């Protein structure tokens, strides 16, 4: 079980002390009853603290269907990483799979999301910023004291949203957090 991997029942072991109780026990929605009812009862009966939070995530659907070996529609994550890149795959899953709900996957959806958000929006913003620094700032990022009012206004956007963003992260609303980031990117 999870605690024996941390050298339990030796509660003085550094692994157990460092990692238990879990701040978050992340599980699939199909095993919620066991992990939210029975597992905590087992832990309590053994005198072990229960995880601080339990969160059940949805499934990643392949073209609208639950992935299944018998259906033959499973995607090998390592092949996806080799094809698209680990950061692109992580971004896609965090953006498209709303925690607690199912999310759809297809190569086409991944390619479109990465091209739209990362290449077009974020990539174009980066290119425009670097071009402006090159053209108007003698190829050096300007010091903060040399910025104008518009610069300061743009830089204040993330600061104004920081509390909202922390709240989203605490509630596992990662996709909403990403939407806030891309709202700022669009400005």
Predicted regions and their residues:
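Long, hydrophobic, amphipathic alpha-helical segments used as structural scaffolds
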Residues: 129-133, 137-140, 169, 173
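Acidic, serine/threonine- and proline-rich low-complexity regulatory regions
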Residues: 164-179
């Amino acid at each position: 079980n999870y605690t024996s991997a941390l050298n339990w029942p030796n509660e003085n072991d550094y692994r157990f002390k460092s990692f238990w109780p879990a701040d978050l026990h992340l599980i699939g929605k199909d095993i919620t009853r066991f992990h939210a009812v029975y597992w905590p009862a087992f832990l309590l009966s053994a005198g072990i603290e229960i995880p601080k939070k339990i969160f059940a995530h949805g499934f990643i659907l392949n073209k609208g269907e639950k992935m299944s070996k018998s259906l033959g529609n499973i995607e090998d994550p390592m092949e996806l990483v080799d094809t698209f890149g680990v950061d692109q795959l992580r971004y896609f899953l965090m953006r498209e799979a709303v925690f607690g709900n199912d999310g759809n996957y297809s190569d086409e959806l991944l390619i479109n999301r990465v091209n739209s958000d990362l290449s077009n929006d974020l990539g174009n913003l980066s290119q425009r910023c670097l071009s402006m620094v090159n053209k108007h700032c003698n190829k050096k990022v300007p010091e903060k004291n040399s910025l104008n009012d518009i610069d300061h206004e743009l830089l204040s956007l993330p600061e104004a949203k920081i509390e909202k963003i922390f709240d989203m992260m605490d509630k596992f609303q990662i996709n909403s957090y990403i939407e806030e980031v891309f709202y700022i990117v669009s400005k």
